[in-house]
């Protein structure tokens, strides 16, 4: 909402109450929230499911969801999807209006990248059919030279904005 952003930019917080959502806030990192149907989806690390150790869990970001109850409390954190989360980093993400398509950032797997100490980011997409997310597809699979990350759909859902370090920009990463 532009009014809320304007108020924040002008230092006017009196009409807003900041509530610590202790149901999901931890000593680890939680960020990049977005509304998805009746849930809040976000990126977090420090969770141990699928990880061999706590130190490994602290190192990787995955996608999580929590339900928003009738009093706007966040309840019951779960991984967003076993298909969308991998052994690499995931997030941030964006959904279409219908909640049937997601775009998200993931470390891409470039042959030999680990040996070269180079790991790029890619944008992946997945569609939800009959309640099940499809296997994610890399949008820019033919390009392993540059990173593509932080996707955001416009409100009409017909334009995808993202950040990249490909040539032709004005800095390291540009929209």
Stretches found by the model and what they are:
Residues 1-175:
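Short, conserved micro-motifs composed of acidic
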């Amino acid at each position: 909402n532009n009014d809320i952003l304007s108020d924040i930019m002008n230092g006017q917080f009196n009409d807003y109450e900041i509530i610590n959502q202790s149901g999901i806030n931890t000593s680890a990192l939680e960020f990049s929230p977005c509304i998805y149907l009746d849930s809040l989806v976000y990126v977090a690390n420090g969770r141990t499911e699928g990880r061999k150790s706590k130190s490994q869990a602290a190192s990787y970001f995955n996608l999580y969801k929590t339900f928003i109850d009738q009093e706007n409390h966040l309840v019951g954190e779960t991984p967003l999807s076993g298909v969308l989360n991998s052994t690499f980093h995931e997030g941030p993400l964006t959904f279409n209006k219908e909640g049937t398509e997601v775009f998200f950032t993931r470390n891409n797997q470039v042959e030999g990248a680990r040996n070269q100490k180079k790991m790029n980011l890619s944008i992946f997409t997945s569609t939800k059919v009959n309640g099940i997310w499809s296997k994610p597809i890399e949008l820019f699979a033919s390009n392993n030279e540059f990173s593509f990350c932080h996707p955001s759909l416009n409100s009409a859902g017909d334009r995808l904005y993202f950040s990249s370090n490909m040539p032709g920009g004005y800095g390291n990463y540009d929209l």
